[in-house]
Amino acid sequence: LSALWASLFHTTVVASEVDIERESSATFSQYNGNGLSFQSNNNTFSLRVRGRLQFRYANPGISQPTERADFEHNAGNQFGVNRARVKLDGHIGLPWIKYGVEYDAVDQRTLTATLSFEKYDALRFKVGQWKVEYSRERSVSSGGQQMMDRSIINRIFTLDRQMGASLYGNFDGPGAANFNYWVGVFNGSGRGDYSNHDGENMYTGRLQWNFLGESVGFKNSDIKRTATPKAALAIAGAKFKSQFTRFSSSGAGNLANFSAGEIEGQYDIQQFVIDGAYFYKGFNAQAEYHEKDIVDLADNNRETTLRGYYVQAGYFLSESISWWPEPLEMAARFGTYSPRDSEQDERFFEKTVAFNYFFNGHENKLTAEVSRVSLDQFDAEVGDETIYSLQWDVSF
């Protein structure tokens, strides 16, 4: 009888341990307005599922002109879903082992897929496909932008999404001794391409000095009305050989005036950017200056240097005008670049004004915008286009 009781007691203990283990590994879900979250009770796994829709009306419905012929194209109005994204993120195993996936439902392609190890602030590691931390403008999410689209210079100088690995971190020293850094090695063939084709990697680096003592993230609009000024200055560079001279979410391609590479590694490219950002009491400003040197190895080492810059600022006028609606921001941007060595031969200009009404920060906002892009050749304007747009961007 004692043996029977002992057996029953042992069975009960084992069953209790199994129940406890099951309970600790069980998952629970919640929705807080910023995605549907799932997390295990023992915190070994988490998943957040988010969606984002961007509805846009534009007249005319064209993208930013990149050559003279674009101004002569008669485009109709655009109305529809401009972006539809599904985002997954969370951690696995340990809270500092993080993953992220972003899927473009409009064009049916994976934009981002990363695995990150972020145990220490000063030393972190990431592998996968994502937007290279190069220029501030491109690193800001399209859902967090101040304007509907990035400036006209973005297409010329961005490294966009690449496959590779990166070390990065933040050194938070006393006073002005606050720095962020990123160094990476990538395929250099753009989104969705697993090969670098020519055996030459893309090498990148970015150093950001947060000289007012607090790290400045990749974001636009001072929605929170920063009480203490925040500012950053950064320099970044990249070096690679490729048959491509530009990158976008669609993948790799070539700029105007550059033919598709006849040989792998035809273009030897070195480029750099200097950028800055500032936030204080509803005011936000940022600017970038770019240079990009392209050597065509298949054309007697012909060298072309592209230059461009933009300045952008936004302000919640309610901070100065009592009757101005508190969620309404006014923003403006000026940008210019030359697609050729001789800046007097050809130069593009952009002038944009936008009004943002934030229902719930960048998670739910309405934007009205007027943007004028023009082209000068030999100091005479030969093309211009003014685009009127209205956009609703909502995340859930």
Describe every region a protein language model picked out.
Residues 17-28, 62, 129, 227-396:
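Outer-membrane beta-barrel pore domains
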Residues 1-21:
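Cleavable N-terminal export/targeting peptides
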